[in-house]
């Protein structure tokens, strides 16, 4: 792949105003700038809308609120984002996570070198020092594994063609199921660097 690629970053959100600001600042500060940010808020919230108004002059940001609240772990919201995403690679994340400034550039560099790569995953740290109910040292490193419950949804970028028509089930463990469903066509590459901060 020699052309510049576009990322679609799908953000599911529910009333985390300050946290979402941190995420947006981390994305808008990326060294690689060819992306769109799709923010889907779960239900109508005027305060959330007011907070978002300061960002909506940037035409890379697509923002809307669903007419009703789904309260289904963000799965319906992720599917809405997937349906409108126009990028070559998709990143799904939550409104309280954030990324290092070089994250998209690192992924882009891999995709340029590895022409068959359609799934890029990377290391993360947990700001709250816990992972899967186990106490960790401050900013412990979490090496992802490609199986259910061992990789966070925000910890990888998948090619849109790989995802195809696959969508999230409305289920608590739907993140893991989604990854398992795209595994069969996956040609992954692992970046051994911390690019994602999980909250």
Please provide the spans of the model-predicted regions:
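The conserved acidic donor/metal-binding loop of glycosyltransferases
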Residues: 94-98
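Conserved nucleotide-sugar donor-binding catalytic segment
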Residues: 141-199
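Short aromatic/hydrophobic "clamp" motif used to bind/position activated sugar donors
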Residues: 90
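Acidic donor-binding segment of Leloir-type glycosyltransferases
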Residues: 24, 28-68
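Cell-envelope/extracellular polymer assembly enzymes that use nucleotide-activated donors
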Residues: 5-8, 36, 177
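N-proximal low-complexity "stem/linker" segments adjacent to membrane-targeting elements
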Residues: 1-26
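Conserved donor NDP-sugar-binding/catalytic core segment of glycosyltransferases
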Residues: 104-134
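Glycine-rich, basic loop-to-helix element that forms the pyrophosphate-binding segment
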Residues: 67-85
